[in-house]
Amino acid sequence: MTDILNYTKSEEIFSAAQELMPGGVSSPVRAFKSVGGQPIVFDRVKGPFAWDIDGNRYIDYIGSWGPAICGHAHPEVITALHEAIEKGTSFGAPCVLENKLAEMVIDAVPSVEMVRFVNSGTEACMAVLRLMRAFTGRDKVIKFDGCYHGHADMFLVKAGSGVATLGLPDSPGVPRTTTANTLTAPYNDLEAVKKLFSENPDAISGVILEPIVGNAGFITPEPGFLEGLRELTTENGSLLVFDEVMTGFRISYGGAQEKFGVTPDLTTLGKVIGGGLPVGAYGGKKEIMSMVAPAGPVYQAGTLSGNPLAMTAGIKTLELLKQEGTYDKLDSLTSRLIEGIIQSAENNGIAINGGSVSAMFGFFLCDGPVRNFNEAKTNDAELFGKLHREMLRRGIYLAPSPFEAGFTSLAHSEEEIDKTIEAFDESFNEIKK
């Protein structure tokens, strides 16, 4: 494949950015700290491709970190947004589009009987934690090592995503009193969860988790794990919360809860439901959601929540995803991709394990299996950095961290998958030397 070597404009712009913004970025993982090399400054995106400011084209497997499941700048989404923006960018008042997207979410997601829109996944998780505590009258919450639920103080305990990427301890500036009620357990370890319930009787409001971990790499639930959490929370009078900001509408139309047949009490959403615009949501049983203001006493608000542009993009995206054969195509393409990646590594004598579920995939450069965050950290970080740089030179844009899942879209074709596997063949051959 043709090597990309010219990053002159990206270098200039990123250098200037470091004088203007902390680290030169608006979100830490974009700085390429864990992989080295030159952060790329994008100019435009379309379909499965991204172009940088120097004119280099990449096959993109980040997809704006998950929202672009239909491909970047899908023409139907763009047309709908053009029509919507003529009416104004934000109303700060009720909007019929909120009703329509709410109906679509409620119809699709098994646990959701009522939904509240916010502006990000972090907001959704902050609000859902407050709601859990209010509904149960309990303060403690269980989260899992490596699972990421946004950057709110109470979740920055053994967190994934950028916290894991940068190898940071629990963040400075977060008082111990804030996280004193946050309990942690290894993902896929039911016994550890049982122990926490035993040690904290009648004190745990609920358990929150990514049903498929996407922010500590790509880690799937062991058989019986999600079912076991459902049983444990019910037995202990606690709530089960699925953070489906990443998996919602990505691994099936009804998310992970539909895919695995386990229904939580509450769900957080984001990414896909905004069609590429800032959005978040949380929802669940009416009995619980009726506690949210102004219907109930649990306060939460937002200036741009439910804005017409995000609602428009979300509605059109879900309409596209609901078409027949959508997830069969995503399953097939992504399976082909990860199988090719694994085969390429094995052909070059490089330890690897990985997998995919529909339009979400990931791999670790280590002996497997990887069932939790501690095992994920056995990934060969130095080798992954070399791989990332080699793939970038060949026009393949992967997440610049081993602790982030990858994403395919409906815009990817077999041609892009084949070119990507070819690039992996060449890159693995290069880094094994």
Swiss-Prot record:
It catalyses: (S)-4-amino-5-oxopentanoate = 5-aminolevulinate. GO terms for cellular component: cytoplasm. It holds the Pfam family Aminotran_3. Its cofactor is pyridoxal 5'-phosphate. Keywords: Chlorophyll biosynthesis, Cytoplasm, Isomerase, Porphyrin biosynthesis, Pyridoxal phosphate. One of its GO terms (molecular function) is transaminase activity. PROSITE patterns: AA_TRANSFER_CLASS_3. Its EC number is 5.4.3.8. Pathway: Porphyrin-containing compound metabolism; protoporphyrin-IX biosynthesis; 5-aminolevulinate from L-glutamyl-tRNA(Glu): step 2/2; Porphyrin-containing compound metabolism; chlorophyll biosynthesis. It is found in: Cytoplasm. GO terms for biological process: chlorophyll biosynthetic process; protoporphyrinogen IX biosynthetic process. Its main location: cytoplasm. The modification N6-(pyridoxal phosphate)lysine is found at K271. InterPro entries: 4pyrrol_synth_GluAld_NH2Trfase (IPR004639), Aminotrans_3 (IPR005814), Aminotrans_3_PPA_site (IPR049704), PyrdxlP-dep_Trfase (IPR015424), PyrdxlP-dep_Trfase_major (IPR015421), PyrdxlP-dep_Trfase_small (IPR015422). Belongs to the class-III pyridoxal-phosphate-dependent aminotransferase family. HemL subfamily. NCBIfam families: hemL (TIGR00713), PRK00062.1 (NF000818). Homodimer. This is Glutamate-1-semialdehyde 2,1-aminomutase.
